[in-house]
């Protein structure tokens, strides 16, 4: 979102240069005395290589490519694109914070250029077929941003696939971030979407867990094994 901050008449008003970087540098100067690290968030197609520019400017960047690449690798039983991305992260020394699911949807726009267009469309269709929701932008089939679904449901609600996905995330370059609902193998919440009404598609992945649900979830094998992975990662 930071890329939309500086605006001026006649400019594209997305990542205006050098104003965008000047603004971030000002914020960094305020943050550093408090030992705070900036983590700029930006969604853009891989082919634009904006993630690389962010890294070259000395900032960490969100790895919005990983969620889709992991599903592609697991569902298509191939590591080609995922391995290429891991190699790039290491070779270019790009510092990331990665994730599988998050409070929003599973990023799709970001995959343009790192996955073939046909495979992105297949990925969208697969997740939608499993109960996910995609916002149709401008009425065009090939204009997309993200698919809203829990990561567990996107993987066909397979505990084995979720554990494999979490293990891949844990061992990928970067700092892992875990969305609480995915830790508890949360399923698509269509009732919450219905209650939210128009524009409430994001509620599919924002279920509020009760104290009892959390306590019961902590006893399940899928949660315990993820916690074991996270403890291993932190050692």
Regions from the PLM with identified roles:
Residues 1-235:
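Active-site and adjacent substrate-binding regions of carbohydrate-active enzymes
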């Amino acid at each position: 979102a930071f890329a939309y901050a500086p605006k001026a008449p006649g400019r594209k008003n997305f990542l205006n240069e050098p104003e965008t970087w000047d603004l971030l540098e000002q914020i960094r100067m305020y943050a550093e005395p408090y030992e705070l690290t900036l983590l700029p968030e930006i969604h853009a197609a891989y082919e634009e290589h904006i993630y690389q520019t962010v890294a070259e400017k000395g900032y960490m960047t969100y790895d919005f490519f990983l969620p889709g690449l992991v599903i592609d690798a697991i569902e298509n039983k191939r590591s080609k694109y995922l391995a290429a991305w891991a190699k790039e992260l290491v070779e270019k020394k790009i510092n990331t914070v990665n994730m599988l699911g998050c409070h929003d949807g599973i990023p799709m726009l970001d995959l343009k250029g790192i996955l073939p267009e046909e495979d992105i469309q297949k990925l969208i269709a697969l997740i939608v077929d499993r109960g996910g929701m995609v916002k149709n932008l401008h009425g065009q089939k090939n204009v997309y941003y993200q698919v809203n679904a829990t990561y567990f449901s996107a993987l066909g609600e397979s505990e084995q696939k979720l554990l494999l996905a979490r293990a891949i995330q844990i061992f990928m370059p970067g700092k892992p971030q875990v969305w609480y609902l995915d830790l508890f193998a949360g399923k698509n919440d269509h009732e919450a979407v219905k209650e939210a009404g128009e524009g409430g598609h994001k509620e599919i992945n924002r279920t509020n867990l009760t104290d009892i649900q959390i306590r019961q979830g902590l006893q399940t094998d899928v949660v315990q094994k993820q916690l074991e992975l996270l403890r291993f990662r932190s050692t």
